[in-house]
C-alpha cells in the first residue's frame, strides 16, 4: 500500500526514507486504510465515520493518527464518509457520489466555514482540515505528513494535499 501511495501521488523523496518518522506515519496510514477496507468489505458497508476522540492505542493497534489518508482515498472510490461520527454526511456523500457517476470530477465531504450573502456575488468558503476527497483537486494531489492545524496536535498525520478546483455554484452544472 505504501508503494501505491508513492506511485500515485507526488511527494518529497525524503518520505521514502524508512528510517524517518514521516515514513512511519505513511506506513501507519496504510495500515489504517487496510483495516478500514477490511471492515467495510466484511460488513458490505458503503460508508463509514471516524472520530478523532478515540483513535485507539498506539501500543495496541498502531493507530497514531486520524485515518485521513484512508478517508480521502475511500471517498474517491465512492465510500460515504462523515467526520466525528456524522453518519448522515456519510450517507449523503455516498448518495451524491452515485448520482455524480459519468460526470467530470466528483464530490467531497466539506464543511461550510464562511458564508457571504451578497446578492449576485454570494459565495461559500468550504474546507476541512483533513478529509477532503481528491476527486475535486485542481491538480495531482501531493502526499505530505504534518501536524494538524487544529484538533489533535500530538502526532503528525499523513494526508493528500491539493488545491480545490473552483466551482461556480450559481451556474448550472447539469444539462
Question: What do these predicted ranges mean?
Answer:
Residues 46-47, 79, 105-108:
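Structural motif
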Residues 127-165:
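Active-site rim beta-loop-alpha module in soluble metabolic enzymes
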Residues 64-95:
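Catalytic or ion-translocation cores adjacent to nucleophile or general acid/base/metal-coordination motifs
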Residues 50-57, 108-130:
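A glycine-rich phosphate-binding loop feature that marks nucleotide/adenosyl-phosphate handling sites
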Residues 84-119:
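Catalytic phosphate/nucleotide-handling subdomain of diverse soluble enzymes
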Residues 167-175:
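Residue-level detector of conserved catalytic or cofactor/ligand-binding positions
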Residues 1-61:
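A charged, amphipathic alpha-helical module
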Residues 57-71, 135-137, 141-144:
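A glycine-rich, aromatic-flanked flexible loop/lid motif
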